[in-house]
Regions:
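C-terminal regulatory domains involved in ligand/effector binding and gene-expression control
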Residues: 1-17, 22-206
Length: 206
């Protein structure tokens, strides 16, 4: 099943630990954000099943990659609550951005869920020519070309890093438990996020 991370991020931040999702081979990408999923979950409501949910409690730092500013890396460390600190640095119009999302103090539905996927026109054009994405891809991404956003207005000045945090939160849902810890990420992608989940799973089961 493809494009699951936005739905998983909404489920994660809604505190849902027991859910059955019936889907086709791909989750609808809608507008490239998690906004619609979060709104539908809120509209449907969440049932308290009367059983305390287990937590994945980080007791010691776990790391993927080397802690160097110029290299992709991320790590998780003990923290009372859930927090994500992210840094990205891409060519214009994105540049260097840093942002912290704290579950207790920030609103996922307002601050993170509306942030959309982004890609370059060149990457999208190539993918369409090779048939790996359809025309609807253009409506679900912020498209970048020649140092500019060419197809939409940004919802936030730093929408790009907000979406990277959204993706990371969705990938962490693969752990199967709410995470109690702080995740610090530098220029990471799904591969690094999922590698951290695998390391966390090993630490929790050994």
């Amino acid at each position: 099943v493809c494009t699951v991370e936005h739905l998983m991020a909404s489920l994660h931040m809604a505190g849902i630990t027991n859910v059955l999702a019936k889907v086709d081979e791909e989750i609808p990408n809608v507008d490239g954000s998690a906004k619609d999923f979060s709104e539908l979950i809120k509209e449907a409501g969440v049932e308290d099943q009367g059983v305390s949910a287990k937590e994945a409690v980080v007791l010691a730092p776990i790391q993927v990659g080397r802690k160097k500013l110029a290299e992709k890396h991320l790590y998780v460390e003990p923290f009372e609550g859930f927090e994500v600190k992210m840094r990205i640095d891409y060519s214009a119009p994105i540049g260097e951005q840093e942002l912290t999302y704290n579950f207790a103090h920030d609103s996922f539905d307002i601050d993170i869920a509306p942030a959309r996927s982004f890609n370059t026109f060149e990457n999208i054009d190539l993918a369409q020519k090779t048939g790996t994405v359809g025309s609807g891809y253009l409506d679900s991404h912020i498209i970048l070309h020649d140092g500019k956003v060419i197809n939409t207005d940004l919802r936030f000045p730093d929408e790009f890093i907000r979406h990277k945090i959204l993706d990371l939160i969705g990938d962490l849902y693969l752990l199967g438990y709410p995470l109690r810890g702080r995740v610090v990420a530098n220029m990471t992608s799904h591969g690094y996020n999922q590698a951290l989940v695998q390391k966390l799973h090993v630490a929790l089961t050994t």
